[in-house]
Amino acid sequence: MGQLALQRLQPLASLPRRPPSLPPPSSATPSLPCATASRRPRFYVARAMSSHIVGYPRIGPKRELKFALESFWDGKTNVDDLQNVAANLRKSIWKHMAHAGIKYIPSNTFSYYDQMLDTTAMLGAVPSRYGWESGEIGFDVYFSMARGNASAHAMEMTKWFDTNYHYIVPELGPDVNFSYASHKAVVEFKEAKALGIDTVPVLIGPMTYLLLSKPAKGVEKSFCLLSLIDKILPVYKEVLADLKSAGARWIQFDEPILVMDLDTSQLQAFSDAYSHMESSLAGLNVLIATYFADVPAEAYKTLMSLKCVTGFGFDLVRGLETLDLIKMNFPRGKLLFAGVVDGRNIWANDLSASLKTLQTLEDIVGKEKVVVSTSCSLLHTAVDLVNEMKLDKELKSWLAFAAQKVVEVNALAKSFSGAKDEALFSSNSMRQASRRSSPRVTNAAVQQDVDAVKKSDHHRSTEVSVRLQAQQKKLNLPALPTTTIGSFPQTTDLRRIRREFKAKKISEVDYVQTIKEEYEKVIKLQEELGIDVLVHGEAERNDMVEFFGEQLSGFAFTSNGWVQSYGSRCVKPPIIYGDITRPKAMTVFWSSMAQKMTQRPMKGMLTGPVTILNWSFVRNDQPRHETCFQIALAIKDEVEDLEKAGVTVIQIDEAALREGLPLRKSEQKFYLDWAVHAFRITNSGVQDSTQIHTHMCYSNFNDIIHSIIDMDADVITIENSRSDEKLLSVFHEGVKYGAGIGPGVYDIHSPRIPSTEEIAERINKMLAVLDSKVLWVNPDCGLKTRNYSEVKSALSNMVAAAKLIRSQLNKS
């Protein structure tokens, strides 16, 4: 593996009480004063070997934060217990970076739930329904905003740009009274300083915060969020003053919104905001970090014109065109934080290739002005490869998790400054060559099949209206049919049984019997509740992607490769390292078993190719769409086998379709074309009477509704309840949707139980724009994370609401 792979995040218990000090980031020179008419700006002079990390995973190497949060929420532990776990995690992270030699170490990137929610707390922008009026925001209000409580629903949650991380969407309006209500940033800076580590506090920038917010309920949807800029900047100024008083010498503003297609007025507002903060930034070195894509030319020009900025950070993994802009114009004396180590994947960096990029930058801005960095926060990758004891040695040698990427950054910085570790670079080159030449990566037959697929189109043989008639004749469903999305609660006993079977501690016969009994319980419950189209509850599945990946070639799985999705929710993305095939049927045995337990329709449950792709760590040696088509062909075989086995309703989840949408509009059509094509490949060969469902999560679908229609599913269920029926506005505007559709009627991510009346009101809102012949009634998402008490109550109210509205329709 070489020296690089042996670097790891220290175990919490092994940390010394008094860590060695790290020289402060700006100890070499005085802080950068703001340019004024009477003073010439003095620019920070970086030493060679400068390195920087945008951000780091907060969950812990073995999900320590997840378990601490859930224990606290369940009342099993107290505030002190939770805060102690968090403090130990922060300490281990900062020390790992310090020991690795990182110069610019971030602070305030830790969060108990979400960094956007932290910013909402910092600004005191708490919606009135949570009952907060003033003072420091505590955990009760903080977690109520994230998760809801008995009397107030949670704030909306949606995808963070095109990642699988979710943020809590701020709710803003003209009457919000902003105030400095959370001192987290300065508290954590002081905490690191007490350990002898001088950090760079990180704040989400004011533009990104506002443009990722939404108008609060009751506020006109046309309300200009940027009109609040003058109201939030005073709070930012207070925070900056607080940090300076605490001894901060650097500040990092994360402004990823700059990679979006911003208009002239938005860019002007950005420029004005930072100009307005100039006096408050005096005495600080300022870094503005962008990531996830190229910075458009006009945004780049605006960024480069800012005064009082010491350095600019760019994603040079996904933002290759930004390199051309840097070549044309980069201001003299400024630092370039070059994001050459991928923060969103798990592949070991090609150190020689990255070094060439850095040398190109050296010719443009000068060696002393280049800082080696990650492309974005390492929040989006797994924590530490050292914890993977079961991965085979060859595959493991191709990988680098967050802890290893920190070492890669410093290795590049050392090499760039003339202190190249020849042994490490040689080992890295050998591992890169091993991956390129390994026979396990390429399957010629699969490559040929994909080439054939790309040359053809795939459509069902008849229109959806004709198919729905054939399906209704077979299924005989009532108006407003009820269903659930797929999963039912995963109990501790169920998880234990799966673990024991995987470890070969119980026999296959005993395992199958246990799953069968779980199916019987779930099916009986649904029949008693009166649900129309059933699911078997997915008791045999640990994860909707991992379950399929484990049965497909070209996939590998980690033991501790967890990544935060939201709050305490973590996912363990599979690794797609090679060409993909389906050796045998994956779900037919289980779906056939479940169907025999009921006379009602039973959904066969599959995960779609785009979602498997977007929720995996994907190979980076071929275009993503080619990998997606390989998965689609495997799912196609499974769909056709399910149909042959007598399964008449098949759900192909595309929960992550939209999150793969490129951030730049110019790139979106190509993605949507191949993503829709991949979905159609999976089911274009089934009979008219076989009903194809799909499900989508956490997305703003308004701008891709025509692509959703083009998917040609018979029924689509959509996560909608936290979005104030934003989706329904599409239909208000006249978009015609002839297939079945089920916008979620209640939020499964909150423990709150909606009343029958509340759900009925939602259904009536939907019927104002959707025909009762196409409307389905269902929860937002799968029920895996809820307990049975919550599920029974919520589903009972959902079915009662559907029956209530159904009876009203029959009378009219």
Curated annotation (Swiss-Prot):
This is 5-methyltetrahydropteroyltriglutamate--homocysteine methyltransferase 3, chloroplastic. The keyword Cytoplasm does not apply. PANTHER family: 5-METHYLTETRAHYDROPTEROYLTRIGLUTAMATE--HOMOCYSTEINE METHYLTRANSFERASE. It comes from Arabidopsis thaliana (Mouse-ear cress). GO terms for molecular function: 5-methyltetrahydropteroyltriglutamate-homocysteine S-methyltransferase activity; methionine synthase activity; zinc ion binding. Catalyzes the transfer of a methyl group from 5-methyltetrahydrofolate to homocysteine resulting in methionine formation. Residues 17-27 have a biased composition (Pro residues). Zn(2+) 1 binds at residues 695, 697, 719, 781. InterPro entries: Cbl-indep_Met_Synth_N (IPR013215), Cobalamin-indep_Met_synthase (IPR006276), Met_Synth_C/arc (IPR002629), UROD/MetE-like_sf (IPR038071). Keywords: Amino-acid biosynthesis, Chloroplast, Metal-binding, Methionine biosynthesis, Methyltransferase, Plastid, Transferase, Transit peptide, Zinc. Expressed in seeds. It comes from the Eukaryota.
